[in-house]
Amino acid sequence: MATPHINAEMGDFADVVLMPGDPLRAKYIAETFLEDAREVNNVRGMLGFTGTYKGRKISVMGHGMGIPSCSIYTKELITDFGVKKIIRVGSCGAVLPHVKLRDVVIGMGACTDSKVNRIRFKDHDFAAIADFDMVRNAVDAAKALGVDARVGNLFSADLFYSPDGEMFDVMEKYGILGVEMEAAGIYGVAAEFGAKALTICTVSDHIRTHEQTTAAERQTTFNDMIKIALESVLLGNKE
């Protein structure tokens, strides 16, 4: 049954959904990587599609920017449409010197300055982590594809334009691989509602050096990330 934010019916979504922030990227993934893809959501322009990848039913849908937006969509997908696994595929900024542009980062865990997980966890710290099997499958998929993916912690920020530059020093000290805006929220939603989740990001800019990828470079590396996500789903079928 349709929700306020998703005009689909039960069965329209696969049990696994890839989620970029940008709905147009969801459309690109569906058109480029899925066979027989059909649109299953268009409320507020947040496009969603379902098709098959090498015979495996998979869905893809945008989640917007920030934890509040992605939390709405992931919650409804899990509780109203029977989705079991969420894979966020997006971009992140690097702070560590050895993390370079176009690197692929697999988010084993996600720190955050948001209070959403404290709200749901009775004001205690919640360890926002990805599902272990999904992490392992993504690592194995990356190796099979010849992509040298990094695995570690992300930082999910509430502010894109942060006024606290010193926080990047703290992130570097604690070995944060990438800064983005959603992973911790998605991991919290998955834990609350009994689903599994993973975030895979491509480094699109370096916060320290101010380097940025070009549109063409982003697209090429983005494709590597999507292939890792899709192949990891196939590996999950063998569990």
Curated annotation (Swiss-Prot):
According to the entry, what is the taxonomic lineage of the organism? Answer: Bacteria, Pseudomonadati, Pseudomonadota, Gammaproteobacteria, Enterobacterales
**What does this chain do?**
Catalyzes the reversible phosphorolytic breakdown of the N-glycosidic bond in the beta-(deoxy)ribonucleoside molecules, with the formation of the corresponding free purine bases and pentose-1-phosphate.
Residues found modified as N6-acetyllysine:
K27
Query: Which positions does UniProt annotate for a purine D-ribonucleoside binding?
Result: H5, E180, M181, E182, S204, D205
Q: Which residues bind phosphate?
A: G21, R25, R44, R88, V89, G90, S91
Q: How does it assemble?
A: Homohexamer; trimer of homodimers.
What's the gene?
A: deoD
Query: What name does this protein carry?
Result: Purine nucleoside phosphorylase DeoD-type
Catalysed reactions, as listed in the record: a purine D-ribonucleoside + phosphate = a purine nucleobase + alpha-D-ribose 1-phosphate; a purine 2'-deoxy-D-ribonucleoside + phosphate = a purine nucleobase + 2-deoxy-alpha-D-ribose 1-phosphate
